[in-house]
């Protein structure tokens, strides 16, 4: 069952770190290269923001994947050197791992996590199928239906966030 393709177009104004301070951001693709870099940048340069990190739980669970796959990344080396144990405290208070999947209705979120989406001010969508030899149906499901499902789910909570869409290599002709 494919999600309805209602046109949802959001063009946010350019945002500076000060604009994002105190805001709640929903970040997808956080276990990927770019998503990890975005999370590090948010923690380093945007004080006071809260990041809801949508993570496919896999066999480890979302929280464990955040700690073992994302926070252990070399991308966090300089920030870890600067903050030491304070980084773990910052992650514990500012990053909320949400066990979810863009391929599932309601993103597969628990009722508690779905309710958290009502407070989202900004979505940064960096999850994508980026393999150049992916089957077309896999690429469409991830890169087209996933973002539509994401926006529909967030908007179903009453939130009307700004959206930053990170595109794949295939968007330009």
Task: Mark where each language-model region is.
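Conserved Rossmann-fold NAD(P)-dependent oxidoreductase catalytic core, especially the SDR/UDP-sugar
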Residues: 118, 122-127, 133-141, 145-173
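N-terminal Rossmann/SDR dinucleotide-binding element
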Residues: 2-122, 126, 136, 157-160
């Amino acid at each position: 069952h494919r999600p309805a393709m209602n046109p949802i177009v959001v063009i946010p104004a350019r945002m500076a770190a000060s604009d994002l301070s105190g805001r709640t951001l929903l970040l997808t693709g956080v276990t990927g290269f770019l998503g990890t870099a975005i999370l590090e940048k948010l923690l380093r340069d945007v004080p006071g923001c809260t990041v809801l990190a949508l993570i496919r739980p896999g066999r480890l669970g979302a929280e464990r994947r955040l700690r073992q796959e994302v926070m252990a990344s070399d991308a966090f080396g300089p920030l870890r050197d600067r903050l030491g144990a304070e980084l773990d405290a910052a992650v514990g208070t500012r990053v909320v791992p949400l066990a979810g999947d863009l391929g599932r209705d309601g993103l597969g979120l628990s009722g508690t996590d779905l309710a958290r989406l009502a407070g989202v001010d900004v979505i940064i969508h960096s999850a994508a199928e980026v393999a150049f030899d992916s089957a077309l149906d896999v690429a469409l499901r991830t890169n087209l239906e996933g973002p539509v499902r994401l926006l529909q789910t967030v908007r179903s909570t009453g939130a009307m966030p700004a959206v930053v869409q990170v595109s794949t290599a295939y968007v330009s002709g």
